[in-house]
Regions:
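Active-site histidine-anchored catalytic micro-motif
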Residues: 9-15, 74-164
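Active-site and ligand/interface coordination hotspots across diverse enzymes
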Residues: 1-41
Length: 164
C-alpha cells in the first residue's frame, strides 16, 4: 500500500477504494477519531479536541498499522462561544451509528473510537449509542466496538493496548 510507505501508517482519507480493499484483505481494524469544533479559552485553536483524537489515532496507527478513519468533527459540547459548532445529542448518535454501520458493512470487525472531547455529555451519548447499536443491529454480532476517551491515555499514548 503506497500510503503506508509514505506516512508510516494508513490514513483512510488518503487511500483509494482499491487500497482500502487491500487493507481489508489483511486487517479488519480501524480507529475512528471523534472530536468537536469548540472553544478552548482564548489560547488554543477551536480544533483542539479533534486534533487530539486524530494525533492519538496516528500515534497508535504508527505502532500497530491499524487504519485511521477520517475524523468526525461534529459532536455536542453545550458551549456557545464564537467558533463552537454543536450538533444535538440525538444527531450525534445518528452520525455515530451511521458511520459505524458503514464501517462494519465494509468488513471492519474491530472499531476503536478515540473520543477527543473531554465533556461527559459526549461520552454518555456514545456509550448509550453503542449499547443500543450492539443490541439492535445484527451486523454487529461479530464486531468489536471499543470506546477510548483520549484523556485515559498516558503521555506516550499507552492506554489503548487494553483492547487493541
Amino acid at each position: 500500500m503506497k500510503n503506508k510507505k509514505s506516512f508510516g501508517f494508513p490514513m483512510m482519507e488518503e487511500m483509494t477504494v482499491q487500497t482500502v480493499r487491500q487493507y481489508l484483505e489483511k486487517k479488519n481494524s480501524v480507529i475512528l477519531p471523534v472530536g468537536i469544533i469548540e472553544q478552548h479559552g482564548y489560547h488554543l485553536p477551536i480544533i483542539t479536541d479533534a486534533l487530539t483524537a486524530r494525533e492519538m489515532a496516528k500515534m497508535v496507527a504508527k505502532k500497530t498499522g491499524i487504519l485511521v478513519a477520517p475524523v468526525l468533527y461534529s459532536s455536542f459540547s453545550g458551549g456557545g462561544l464564537s467558533g463552537t459548532i454543536n450538533i444535538s445529542p440525538s444527531v450525534m448518535s445518528l452520525v455515530i451509528n451511521d458511520t459505524l454501520v458503514s464501517l462494519a458493512s465494509q468488513g471492519f470487525k474491530k472499531i476503536y473510537i478515540f473520543l477527543g472531547h473531554g465533556g461527559g455529555e459526549n461520552l454518555n451519548v456514545l456509550e448509550i449509542s453503542l449499547k443500543v447499536l450492539l443490541r439492535n443491529n445484527p451486523i454487529f454480532s461479530d464486531v468489536v466496538l471499543a470506546l477510548f476517551p483520549v484523556w485515559s491515555f498516558d503521555e506516550s499514548g499507552r492506554g489503548w493496548k487494553k483492547a487493541v
